[in-house]
Every structure is written in structure tokens, then in C-alpha cells.
A protein has these predicted regions:
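Surface-exposed amphipathic alpha-helical tracts and adjacent flexible/coil segments at the periphery
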Residues: 1-197
Length: 197
């Protein structure tokens, strides 16, 4: 059977074969103890010492999301779909697996040549959406794109949440945002400017 990762965090090295963590901290990524040095900010200099990028997360990749390629992967002979979930919370696993289950069920219903490998049907009492779970932005990870800039997340290694709008005005006591998302007391908000967060 052909297995393919379809969703989750990406390693700037070959996952499970990065030695940066072990060299700098003694924690082996090969044993599930990655210190995630790729998620730290770095400053990039050219050969003359001129700063090209300052305090950017230059090695931090977006998360893989191959929702749009799911049917093409099945057509290519993939029979095992993998979701990266190491150290993820239960809500993440529930949401993301439900998302892909719904997508697969829709394909199976439309394409009778595909046969389920198991019996039964799963019902969900929520609307799964990977944008609602922790993510660093999504990329199909060079599956369909040749633009390598679409795979990195240099401004932050954190989950940015949903886009809520554009800051229109800032005063000493308030911030005015033009957007369509409803906000509630206690919601966390990230601000991005021209140089990142």
C-alpha cells in the first residue's frame, strides 16, 4: 500500500532525521524529543555582513494541508492517509480526522470504484474545520506549487487563528477593526504589521 502524509506540522529537515536539536540540546528528534530550534527567530546576513532579514522565523514551515488534492492522491493509488499528530491535543485530533473523514466519505459516495477498507459510518455533531485547530497557516507543500515561498511561515511559528480584519484606528483605550468576525471577551488577538507580528 502507498502511504502519504496529508496534514500536519512540517519539519524543515527530513522529519525524524534532524540533528539540530540533538547537537544543540542533546534532545533527539529521532526519539520524539525535538527542541524545535527551527521555530526560533534568526537573523540572516549576506557575505558582507549586511542584514537581509532580522529576527525572522526563517526555518519555520507552515503546516501541510492536502485537502484540495485528496481525490488526486486516491487516483494516484494512495491507500493510507496519514495525519501528523504528535503532541497534539484531543480537540485537534478530533477536528482534523473528522474533516478528512467527511471529505473521504464525499469522494466514496461519488466514486463507486473506491471501496471502504472498514465498515460503518461516522456521524459528527459539529462542523469540522482545520482552520479552527492549531495551525501555522497551510501549504500543500510543493505538491502542486513550485513557489517555495508558500511553504514558510517567517513571521511567527505560532497559530495565528482566523483572520478577523484590518486595524483602522488605535487609541489609548481601544482598537477599531474593520472585519466580519464576531469577537468575544477573552479572545486572543495577533497583530501583524509590515515587519511581522
Amino acid at each position: 500500500p502507498l502511504e502519504v502524509f496529508i496534514h500536519g506540522a512540517l519539519c524543515v529537515s527530513y522529519s525524524g532525521q534532524c540533528y539540530l536539536s540533538h547537537c544543540l540540546s542533546g534532545r533527539s528528534a529521532n526519539r520524539g524529543e525535538c527542541a524545535q530550534y527551527c521555530r526560533l527567530p534568526y537573523t540572516l546576513l549576506d557575505a558582507d555582513g549586511k542584514v537581509l532579514e532580522k529576527n525572522k522565523h526563517l526555518l519555520s514551515l507552515k503546516d501541510m494541508n492536502r485537502t484540495d488534492s485528496l481525490e488526486a492522491l486516491l487516483d494516484a493509488g494512495v491507500s493510507s492517509l496519514k495525519i501528523e499528530g504528535r503532541l497534539k491535543e484531543m480537540s485537534y485530533v478530533k477536528n482534523v480526522t473528522a474533516w478528512y473523514r467527511k471529505k473521504l466519505d464525499a469522494i466514496l459516495e461519488r466514486r463507486p470504484e473506491y471501496v471502504r477498507s472498514s465498515s460503518g459510518k461516522t456521524d459528527f455533531f459539529f462542523a469540522p474545520d482545520p482552520n479552527k485547530s492549531f495551525n501555522r497557516g497551510f501549504t500543500p507543500y510543493l505538491l502542486n506549487e513550485k513557489d517555495s515561498r508558500s511553504i514558510s511561515s517567517p513571521d511567527t511559528p505560532k497559530s495565528m487563528g482566523e483572520y478577523i480584519g484590518t486595524v483602522k484606528q488605535v487609541s489609548s483605550k481601544s482598537i477599531t477593526v474593520a472585519g466580519v468576525q464576531k469577537l468575544n471577551n477573552g479572545d486572543g488577538i495577533c497583530f501583524f504589521n509590515e515587519s511581522g507580528i
